[in-house]
Curated annotation (Swiss-Prot):
InterPro entries listed in its UniProt record: Cu-oxidase-like_N, Cu-oxidase_2nd, Cu-oxidase_C, Cu-oxidase_fam, Cu_oxidase_CS, Cu_oxidase_Cu_BS, Cupredoxin, CuRO_1_LCC
Residues that bind Cu cation 2: H86, H129, H546
GO CC terms, sorted: apoplast; Casparian strip
GO molecular function, one term: copper ion binding
Role, per record: Lignin degradation and detoxification of lignin-derived products.
Predominant localisation class: secreted
Record's protein name: Laccase-1
Origin superkingdom: Eukaryota
Residues that bind Cu cation 3: H131, H487, H544
Enzyme class, broadest EC rank: oxidoreductase
Tissue: Expressed in roots, stems and flowers.
Organism this protein belongs to: Arabidopsis thaliana
Length: 581
């Protein structure tokens, strides 16, 4: 199975050479995804795994900035499915965004749907994944946008690129894991392994052969495209004996940041430069381990792979030499932070700044038209009568924003909005501030009432509005780092802090010069984060925690951007093959 690691790398090398790293030309690129079962073995455990085209991870979508993309998805399983193109803005094409019951009804068994959209003013590393129940545990892949212009990275010529997709593996059927969690009201069973490009590596049982390996030449520079497709865990990543240079996050160029390790949340991407500055013939660990802020059970293991330097070995000793090199690499200390190292996670996140050059300006709104402040909370709900619940104190776990636990409707919100048939589907009364003001991060999690309301509540803004959303963490049950993803828009993280947000003092300390531009960000443990959005994309857009367990519990909301005054500022009509509920 080690050959699978080389297969993934060679596929990317082929893309790197057939799709030039930059091009001013654009075209229509077509792909076909078959969602299907595939028998896969990991950790000495064989099971039917949900895949795209039988691949785990799924196929890479590689396009150029300005391309029109058509991806036909055929559902070959008995369950409904959808695919989300994570981080793609979908300007005026919300029908192609993918979250089930938000922008489309799911694709039914034996049916197909073609996602059509244009890649406009975006370049870099993104991802795609399933967006129905917990299918994205194995249905995911890289989405690479090559730029019109040369990379702005200074320094050495780029030799090639290496994709590294982080994931999780369960020996159990993940659908059953989710169902058990929702039935019992308890937390989900943790994964059995973390993976690098679908491979757990030699620290897990029966997995020496299932180890990711990338080959480099000494003296050359490589692009590492790091994608966190894990279901429920933020991760630290490092390469032994190497300094990494961050040059892009979430497909947006950044000022260079030199670091020994990174923290990356589910849904985030980080593009790094790795200079192969070690001696030929060596091997070095690349490792990922969780960043933990939760009191809930978690997988505390580490996945590793290898960066192998080319170099001649004597034929008669090649196997033994390779084994000795690998043992030496395994004994090398990797500069991974401690799993509880919030200080490092905070410092790293704060170090990321937008490039802010003349060619790639930072278009952060310096003034706002609307501010929404929302709490993000884990909740406990009373157990229904005649039912046993396994959550804390015999209750059920839920989650909420401003004490509203999001409920998906039985039909698409976008379609009902477009047809002006919202009655009974959703309402536009999401509270724009917490219903009660209290010490959000100092509350006693035992004595407080942690019940929540349920609903499909959104808020609405005018086209072109300059929107600020402040996400306030709470200490209900646990203070925790929440990675939140905004669909349909990039945003600027203008402020972050610990404790409670102060609307008078904290905005005075905002970074309105070069804040990081992202599509997914982490609200600090026991703190808050403020983002600003240029709301210039008409449609219905989902905001949710990218820890899938929390989304299932209701940690989500949505907002609507109304049509603008010009034809080019209006939502396009639905496609003819849009799935029906």
């Amino acid at each position: 199975m080690e050959n699978l690691g080389f297969l993934i790398i060679s596929t990317f090398l082929l893309l790197f050479t057939t799709l030039l790293p930059y091009s001013s030309a654009s075209t229509t690129r077509r792909f076909h995804f078959n969602v299907e079962w595939k028998k896969v073995t990991r950790l000495c455990h064989t099971k039917q795994l949900l895949t795209v085209n039988g691949q785990y991870p799924g196929p890479t979508v590689a396009v150029h900035e300005g391309d029109i993309v058509e991806i036909k998805v055929t559902n070959r399983i008995a369950h409904n499915t959808t695919i989300h193109w994570h981080g793609l803005r979908q300007y005026r094409t919300g029908w192609a965004d993918g979250p089930a019951y938000i922008t489309q009804c799911p694709i039914r068994s034996k049916q197909s749907y073609t996602y059509r959209f244009k890649v406009e003013d975006q370049r870099g590393t993104l991802l795609w994944h399933a967006h129905h129940s917990w299918q994205r545990a194995s249905v995911y892949g890289a989405f690479i946008i090559y730029p019109r212009q040369p990379y702005p990275f200074s320094g050495s010529h780029i030799q090639s690129e290496i994709p590294i997709i982080l994931g999780e593996w369960w020996n159990d059927d993940v659908d059953n894991v989710e169902k058990a969690m929702m039935k019992t009201g308890a937390g989900a069973k943790v994964s059995d392994a973390y993976t690098l490009n679908g491979l757990p590596g030699p620290l897990y049982p029966c997995s020496t052969k299932d180890t990711f390996t990338a080959t480099v030449d000494a003296g050359k520079t490589y692009i590492l495209r790091i994608i966190n497709a894990a279901l429920n865990n933020e991760l630290f990543v490092a390469v032994a004996n190497h300094t990494l240079t961050v040059v892009e996050v979430d497909a947006v160029y950044t000022k260079p940041v030199h670091t020994k390790a990174i923290m990356i949340a589910p849904g985030q991407t980080t593009t790094l430069l790795l200079r192969a500055d070690q001696l030929s013939g060596g091997e070095f660990l690349i490792a990922a381990t969780p960043y933990v802020t939760s009191v809930f059970p978690f997988n505390n293991s580490t996945t590793v792979g290898f960066i192998r330097y080319t170099g001649k070995t004597k034929p008669e000793n090649s196997v033994n030499t390779r084994r000795r090199r690998r043992l030496t690499a395994m004994s090398t200390v990797v500069a991974l932070p401690n799993m509880l190292d919030t200080k490092f996670a905070t410092k790293f996140s704060d170090s990321i700044k937008s490039l802010g050059s003349a060619k790639y300006p930072c278009k952060v709104p310096t003034k706002i038209d609307k501010r929404v402040i929302t709490t993000i909370s884990l909740n406990l709900q009373d157990c229904p009568l005649n039912q046993t619940c396994d959550g804390y104190a015999g209750k059920r776990f839920f989650a909420s924003m401003n004490n509203i636990s999001f409920v998906r409707p039985p039909i698409s919100i976008l379609e009902s909005y477009y047809k002006k048939q919202s009655k009974g589907v959703f309402s536009l009364d999401f509270p724009e501030k917490p219903p009660n003001r209290f010490d959000f991060t100092g509350v006693d999690p035992v004595s407080e009432n942690m019940n929540t309301e349920f609903g499909t509540k959104l808020f609405e803004v005018e086209f072109g509005s300059r929107l600020e959303i402040v996400f306030q963490g709470t200490s209900f049950l646990n203070i925790e780092n929440h990675p939140l993803h905004v669909h349909g828009h990039n945003f600027f993280v203008v402020g972050r802090g610990f404790g409670n947000f102060d609307p008078e003092k904290d905005p005075k300390r905002y970074n309105l010069v070069d804040p990081p531009e992202r599509n997914t960000f982490a609200v600090p443990t026991g703190g808050w984060a403020a983002i600003r959005i240029n709301a210039d994309n008409p449609g219905v857009w989902f905001i949710h925690c990218h820890l899938e367990q929390h989304t299932s519990w209701g940690l989500a909301m949505g907002f609507i951007v109304k049509d603008g005054p010009l034809p080019s500022q209006t939502l396009l009509p639905p496609p003819h093959d849009l799935p029906q509920c």
